[in-house]
Regions:
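Catalytic phosphate/metal-binding cores of nucleic-acid and nucleotide-processing enzymes, i.e., regions
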Residues: 1-130
Length: 130
């Protein structure tokens, strides 16, 4: 299938990790585990046969990370890379791709998506055939 796969995650700020955060390693590990399990669960609910998953070296993809913030404050979308990395690892666990290395995921782009419309952040992963 050539249409993109879109996965949406609604998260509180306390459920996310920014590159600017200076967290204790145990707290960071707990949040990472939560995000990874959440993405694994969402990945299991995706119609893998319909989308022709898993992606592999012969069938690479690219990932676009859309960040929707709850306020109009300025921020840097790439600062949410620790959050998106944990989500991508969860999708690896769900067998979305054979591995999340550069042979399979050719690029990861971070983009501002606008306001989330509520008090939570919304992270949308758009996975497109390369």
């Amino acid at each position: 299938m050539t249409e993109p796969i879109k996965l949406t995650f609604e998260l509180d700020r306390k459920q996310m990790i920014s590159a600017n955060d200076r967290l204790h390693f145990q707290k960071k590990a707990k949040i990472t585990k939560f995000l990874r399990q959440l993405a694994h669960y969402e990945g299991q609910n995706t119609l893998r046969d319909y989308f022709g998953l898993p992606f592999n070296e012969g069938k690479p993809c690219k990932v676009i990370v859309w960040v929707f913030a709850p306020t109009n404050r300025r921020y840097d979308p790439p600062n949410w890379s620790p959050t998106s990395k944990a989500l991508l690892d969860g999708l690896t666990d769900a067998k979305f791709w054979t591995d999340d290395n550069y042979h399979v995921i050719k690029s990861t782009d971070f983009r501002h998506g606008g306001k989330s419309g509520n008090k939570k952040y919304r992270i949308e992963l758009e996975i497109v055939n390369e």
